[in-house]
């Protein structure tokens, strides 16, 4: 079972949710499928991305792995049922690679900032590589989460949690990312 290694202000880290060997296999998979990736590059972010929805069996397996940690996050943060979404779903899983000593990074931002992202209520990043740099930082809270194989980082996606993916200087950084979304049922719409 994964170990809780950080739980502060709803920023929660679990270590060991994926075995190191599986992390290595997933990285190999990414590199073998590099022709299915695209380069995301703007003035405030740069990385290589593979959307796992193009390979449904992998996306389903990763989603199945993440679901129990949503419940554990709720429990570990003492979130009561009356304020937690009664139903939710996961956004498509994205696989990202940040190369060292390049412009790859994701400057300070929030992950739910408009109509297209407003149904997100929980961020989930799984680190697949060990890195001495490339931390996910929360400058307002003086928290930095180091990339570590098999580590899961969870936190709210809104403007109260601005964060950044810092530049990598040692080896490529690989992460899987998804979001829990509010899933509106017809009888909930009022």
Kindly give the residue locations of the regions a language model identified.
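Fe(II)/2-oxoglutarate oxygenase catalytic core
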Residues: 1-152, 160-190
